[in-house]
Each structure stands twice: as C-alpha cells, then as structure tokens.
Amino acid sequence: MIRNSGRILFNSLKNSNVKLINRNVIINSNIRLFSTSTNNTIKESVEKKAETISNKDNIASPSSKSIDVSDLAGNADYNFVFERIKTCDKENYINSLLISDPIARRVAYAIRAFNIETVANDHSPKSEKISRLRLSFWKDAINNIYNGKVYDQPLTRVLAQVIKEKKLTKTWFIKILNRREKDNQQVQIKDMEELEQYADDIHSSLMLLTLEGLGVKGNHDVEHCASHLGKAIGIMVLIRGTVYHLASRKTYIPVSLTTKYGINVESLYRGDPQIEKLQNAIYEMASCAKLHLDKAKQFRGKIPHPATEAFLSVSVVEDFLERLRKADFNIFEFPNTQQHPLLLIKLYKNKFFKQF
C-alpha cells in the first residue's frame, strides 16, 4: 500500500494529543442587532428589518445606519466576541489566550470571530444562498470600516477598533472572503496545488493578521513561516472535517486523488466509506501538511518574539498528524475529540520559553 512506504515521514513527531473541535466546520449563530439611536421611528424600522431575517437563515445583520469610527467598541462588544470564540472555536480560543499582550489578544479574538462568521453552515442550495448574502455583508462591512464607517453591530465595532489600533492590512480580510465565496460554489478542489492555495488564502491570511496584531509586519522570515504553517493548519482542518463534510455532500479531497485511487465521491456521500482508497488519499493530504509543517519548523531560532506566540499551533498540527498516523489514516476511526493534558502543557512551555 502506498501509504506504508511513506510513513517514515511522520517518525519525527512526538506523541501528544490535542482537544479538537467537535465540528470542523464552525457553525454560525445569530449576532444580535444593536441600535444606538434614540429615535423611535428609526428604532422601529431597524427592529422590523431584523424580524424579516429568520433565525434559521442566520445572517449577521447591520443596523439601519452606520456609526462613525470615533464611536467604536465597548466592553459588551469585546465580551460578545470573547464568548463567540470560546463557544465555537475552543482550539483557537486557547491559542489566542496564550498571547501576552492584551491588545494583540483582542486582535486575535476579533480575527477568529470574523473567520467564524464567514464559514458556511452546510452546502445545501438554500444555505449556499444564505452564505452568499453573509459574505456580501462582510465584504461591505470590511470595505466600510476602511472608508471610515462601521455597521452598528458588535463584531464590526470590534474589528473597526482593532483595525484602527493596529492598522491591519485590508488585503488579508478580502483574500479570506474571496476564497470563501469561491468555496461556496459546489465545485470539488482540482488538485493538491489548489488545496494548498485554499489553505494559504484562509489560514495564512488569518496568521498574518494575528502577526500584525502582535506588531510584526514586513519580516520576510516571519511571513514565510506563516505561509507554510498556514498551509499545514488549513490541510489539517480539512482532513479533520472530512466525515462532517461528507455528511453535508461536500468533499475537500482533490479530484486528482479521487481519480488516482478510484474513489467514487457519490458513493462516499451515500455512506460507502471505501476505507482503503480513502486512507491512501488522506495519507497524501497529510504528507503535504507534514511537508509544510517541517518547512515552518526550519525557521525556529529565526523568529523574533512576540511573533513566536502566533506559531504555537505547530504543536497542535504535530499532535494531529501523529494521532492520524496511529489511526492508519482511517478518518472513520480517528479519535477526533480526544484530549490530552500534555499538549496544553507543551503550549505553555513553548510560550514561556518564547519558542514554537
């Protein structure tokens, strides 16, 4: 079997475990609508608009007006974002909690909350339409923030605040949204190169925004490391969510791999696991993630503090790949929710010694 000949690729990984998210596609919940106006007519108009959007549709909604950039986030807004991450993205909640600087930590939480809001719940035709509306809203919201106007809504106020404080680059936000829009189409990823590009567009962009929050910008080694680690994380997330994706009639296994190993995608959707064929495909995806992880680790010793705090996820990816190897790349038997306290200890140790 092809995966047996290449398992030596994973021998350098140490055993540890990580608490993973039960659902790898993060599910959005409704964001409350806020109105700062005391004018009853405007208030009633806003509430009427809010009622037209059902809870099931689940679209983040601005108020009927924008607020000026000078009137930004308060404690309630930050608490909303904090609880959003704590509830929906425990893994990055912990990683962001380990960032020492409180302002940089707020930036990390805002960025991760933004990522949550851009993820589709599922890939049904109705959800596809809702996702398009949601992404359109967030693209307008980001453009407005950079033009000095802010939708009167908790996360947009927080984003406006951190963008103003840290001068975050607009390009990374738009890059994430453009990839989400493309992903919203019912098209299977073509090959490994496109898979890497998907991971880079989303997860490397998130990492670069986090680094800007830490005050690190324009460092070639840091950005190169972020690109490789972002690709490794992105591929890990897609592998980890394979079972959930299949249940939603979606797969991120590239066409080149399903063709190479004779995987019938429609049969996968209908419940035929095709375990051995799928193991081979998952092995190749994991090998690609391992390759980028190793390239990121080559920058150890070259990354200045506090940038190292953005790269603590190296330990998370290492743990995932090692546990996947032990499961023989069988995602149907993979302990996806298993937690081991040693991983958290390792994360704290790396933070303390300013390494990754």
Swiss-Prot record:
Coiled coil: none
Localization in the cell: Mitochondrion inner membrane
Targeting signal (transit peptide) range: 1-41
Keyword list, A-Z: Membrane, Mitochondrion, Mitochondrion inner membrane, Transit peptide
Alphabetical list of InterPro entries matching this protein: Isoprenoid_synthase_dom_sf, Squ/phyt_synthse
Chief localisation class: mitochondrion
GO cellular component: mitochondrial inner membrane; mitochondrion
Function description: Involved in the assembly of mitochondrial NADH:ubiquinone oxidoreductase complex (complex I) at early stages.
Family: Belongs to the NDUFAF6 family.
Identification of the protein by name: NADH dehydrogenase (ubiquinone) complex I, assembly factor 6 homolog
